[in-house]
Amino acid sequence: ALQQGDIDMVWAYSTGVAGTYQDVLSTDTNVSLVNVAAANAPAVLAFNNAKGLFSDENLRQAVSYALNYEEFKTYFGSAYAEIPNRGFVPSTTVGYTDTEKLTTDTAKADEYMKAAGYTEKNADGFYVNADGAAAAFTLTVNAAKETHVGYAEMIKTQLEAFGIQV
């Protein structure tokens, strides 16, 4: 509708224009895009730190380094997408303290798994501890948000390829 002149403006306050549309709209000479740094966290992977698998910080760090952020950027971002920094607070927040970019480093993720006591992999390719229990967890997602379901599917695929059962 925007490209055909049926509407004059798209305003999606909390989400902006989806990355897949940004790439198309950016080449249209009749459309102007205004890009503003995000002041929110559109997707967050939150852990239960109090009990279970992720009560061990080493496992949370392993997940962080096992994920392929370039793949997330490619599939869910746009030409304007950037891999965020570590931490929960967006850089546009007043008082923000700079942190390093999220990076993929499966060797470092493997070191964190070993530090948590998951030193071997079973026949299915999942890390196991000394008791033979696999590193496994349940990922819960709001199914009403299609993009979040896509994030969850990619997280599952990437972590299971690394050796954590989801």
Please report, for each region that a protein language model flagged, where it lies by residue.
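Append "and occasionally in soluble cytosolic enzymes with long acidic Gly/Pro-rich linkers
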Residues: 55-157
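Periplasmic binding protein-like
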Residues: 2, 8, 139, 157-166
